[in-house]
């Protein structure tokens, strides 16, 4: 048997073991503490130490490192830097399994933190329940399923007696769900490889890019007044309904988004970037016109639109200029211009389809998962920093991302095992078997 056949045979024989590995990882809560209602769950450290032992037993050289905002101050204007985040009991885990030499190295990466459980679960979110071929638990899809799959792929190669020329490296990080400072710290610590796979859930599709995400709050001022009475002209002190002014601006964003359908599209994304309003808060009393309206929006941006710091500064200005242009067409808004408070800027990244690593991964995908396609992540992942330091990086992992953050999050066992085999094949090809 060749290497791939040996690995697949081992995995077929040890499928129950690899499933139990994921279930045990799901039983260890690792909720990001910035979701306050879950702060008592001991954060990510216990899960990282469980994985560390698994790697140690395979022969990895491992270490735990704790991100520190003060030590990362030089990155304060760049992606992932969150000065108020603390990392007690929140380590990154890094490990390397040395090859025999003269081969290319590969980093396998994922985030160990998960979001809060929320309500309406019918399975214990930290049980790892296995029912009808599905494994349930918070993080099953996002993204302990991917972490378990990439780690099990290395174990299958190791247990099959195969030696590699290149090093295999594992980097599991914290804080992806609340800013991305874990990956910033991992990269700043100097960890590098010739290529990287982030095993975010892609349904086994190959995602060579992810989009950046901007959250902003659009604030529109009005002037309160009795809602049941006739209004005087605003120039004479009459009331101005902030909700009316918000609607005026919202209508203009239809034109904005139509333009973005062409200027913010990408061949590997199923939908273009758009600016969508998600929350609305206005007014103080039922009997008064709203004196202020606040609208929170989500806007996406492409890697090609990043600014010099790897963030969405250019797109922020584009949005601000558009709002200013709309305001200039309304007398009240011209004198009382709306403003935007920026809440979040999550970075993005892209690996060209001309890169050798993309071609190797695509070949393995076609051989192992013929129905899979090349399709970028519409949401944010941690790939930006790896790309920033010159590491060709792709997202490829098991599970349907639409199930992430939901009650009864689950991953299908069949797809999980299929992903392990696929990642193992990529490792064998990229890091090269010895003769």
Language model: regions and residue ranges:
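Hydrophobic/aromatic beta-strand patches that form the interior of the parallel beta-sheet core
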Residues: 63, 106-108, 171, 195-197, ...
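Short, solvent-exposed loop/turn segments at the edges of secondary structure
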Residues: 90, 123, 192, 211-215, ...
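Fold-level recognition of mixed alpha/beta catalytic cores in primary-metabolism enzymes, strongest
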Residues: 132-135, 140-255, 405-421
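Metal-dependent amide/peptide-bond hydrolase catalytic core
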Residues: 1-13, 57, 87, 116, ...
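Acidic/His- and Gly-rich active-site-bordering loop/insert found
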Residues: 2-135, 164, 400
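Beta-strand secondary-structure signal
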Residues: 23, 94, 165, 169-171, ...
């Amino acid at each position: 048997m060749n290497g791939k056949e040996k690995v697949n045979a081992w995995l077929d024989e040890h499928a129950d073991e690899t499933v139990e590995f994921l279930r045990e990882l799901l039983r260890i809560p690792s909720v990001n503490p910035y979701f306050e209602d879950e702060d008592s769950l001991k954060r990510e450290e216990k899960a990282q130490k469980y994985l560390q032992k698994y790697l140690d037993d395979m022969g990895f050289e491992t270490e735990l490192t704790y991100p520190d905002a003060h030590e990362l101050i030089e990155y304060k204007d760049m992606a992932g830097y969150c000065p108020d985040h603390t990392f007690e009991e929140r380590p990154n885990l890094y490990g390397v399994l040395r090859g025999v030499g003269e081969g290319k190295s590969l980093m396998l990466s994922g985030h160990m933190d998960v979001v809060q459980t929320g309500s309406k679960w019918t399975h214990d979110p930290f049980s790892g329940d296995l029912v009808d071929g599905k494994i349930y638990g918070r993080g099953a899809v996002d993204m302990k399923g991917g972490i378990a799959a990439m780690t099990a792929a290395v174990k299958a190669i190791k247990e099959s007696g195969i030696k590699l020329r290149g090093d295999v490296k594992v980097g599991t990080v914290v804080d992806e769900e609340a800013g991305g400072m874990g990956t910033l710290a991992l990269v700043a610590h100097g960890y590098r490889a010739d290529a990287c796979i982030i095993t975010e859930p892609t349904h086994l599709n190959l995602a060579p890019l992810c989009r950046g995400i901007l959250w902003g709050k659009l604030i529109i001022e009005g002037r309160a007044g009795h809602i049941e009475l006739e209004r005087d002209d605003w120039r004479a002190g009459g009331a101005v309904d902030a909700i009316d002014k918000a609607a005026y601006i919202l209508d203009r964003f239809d034109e904005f988004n139509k333009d973005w359908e062409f200027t913010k599209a990408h061949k590997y994304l199923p939908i273009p970037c758009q600016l969508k309003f998600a929350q609305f808060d206005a007014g103080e009393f039922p009997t008064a016109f709203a004196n202020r309206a606040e609208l929170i929006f989500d806007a996406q941006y492409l890697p090609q639109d990043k600014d010099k710091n790897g963030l969405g500064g250019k797109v922020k200005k584009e949005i601000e200029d558009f709002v200013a242009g709309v305001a200039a067409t309304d007398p009240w808004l011209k004198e009382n211009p709306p403003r935007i408070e920026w809440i979040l800027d999550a970075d993005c990244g892209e690996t060209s389809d001309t890169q050798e690593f993309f071609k190797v991964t695509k070949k393995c995908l076609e051989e192992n998962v013929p129905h899979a396609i090349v399709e970028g992540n519409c949401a944010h992942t941690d790939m930006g920093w790896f790309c920033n330091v010159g590491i060709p990086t792709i997202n490829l992992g098991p599970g349907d991302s639409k199930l992430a953050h939901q009650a009864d999050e689950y991953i299908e066992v069949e797809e999980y095992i299929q992903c392990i085999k696929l990642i193992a094949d990529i490792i064998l090809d990229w890091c090269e078997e010895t003769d």
